Structures are given as C-alpha cells and as structure tokens.
C-alpha cells in the first residue's frame, strides 16, 4: 500500500471546516500545528510590527488515492484557488511506521469499495 502526506496550510478560521471536509472525503486523524507565515506581498505594519494572522498546518497521512480525493474535497469546499486563505498539497511517503493496523484495514476497505 502506498501512502501520501496531505499538508494543508490554512487561515485559522478555516481549520474546523477543513477537518470536517477531509472527514467527509474519508480522511481520518490529523495532526494540527500552529504556524505563522510570511506572504509574498508586504502587509501593513503597526509600529513596525507586521501582523499576518495565525495559521494552521493540517497534516494527514493517507493512502495515496484517498489523499487525492481529500485534496480535491478541500479545494472544492474551501475554494482555496480563489480565496488566498490557504494552500494544500500532497507528498509521497516511502517509509511509514506506526500506523494503526485497523486504520490500514479501513484504507484497504475504502480502496475495495471504490473498485
């Protein structure tokens, strides 16, 4: 079975919507990391301090085909291409340890259901 990491870097206000969207598409557990970012365009400053707003980094470890489905669902539900409030992408994973065997069985069942 091949795995992928789906990474979504989003404005904090989209975090819950993104998690719900991923779950609807078959995504399971997620690791949430608080983050700050610096965009390509300069933002307004206040007394020399720039406030970009906080962001959330959502990290999902998914079966490869499922990661594409979840990514498309996130893009559809959050309108990432048009809102400039986030970015999502997948990365292939070569070696993975620590995934619950029950989760692997769920991935396998989802693949069989899709065939």
Enumerate the language-model features and the residues they cover:
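Positively charged, small/polar-rich N-terminal and surface patches that mediate targeting and assembly
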Residues: 1-115
